[in-house]
Amino acid sequence: MRVDKIIFIFLISFILIYPFSVKAQVPPSREIQKAQAAEEARQFIREYTARFMKLELDPFMELFSKRAVENRMLPYADIREAYRKTIEGSRSIVYSLDIDSIQTYTQSANVTGRYKIVQGFKKGGKTVFGGDIQWDLIRENGSLKIREVNYGRSW
């Protein structure tokens, strides 16, 4: 009988010390989801910048949806050709970016900012230009892709 009491007391004290968790699984709050989506968009833009500066066309173009449009008029095939020419003629590209805002939605994000590009040419010399930029990102097959990118030039 004494052993039964000891076991009973041990079980009760164990339950009191380590209560069973019966919390319901609650989805993250809307604010947490928005913060996570904004961070995912920031990471995407960092990847965009890094891939562009590596001067490798195929990995860079993987970031674009096949339905992408640039500067409200260039379709994907023309975007690819323009970047191919840019990369072929470049010795180096330094791309810097300041993000002004990120707006997130269920399956997309809109990012605005200012960019600066320093492009060194294979034939010598360099050019510097920059301006406003806006990305419209969509989720395709679980990852973000560029649906639209619009470059402005202010200098």
Predicted regions and their residues:
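Bacterial N-terminal signal peptides that target proteins for export
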Residues: 1-9
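Bacterial N-terminal signal peptides
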Residues: 9-18
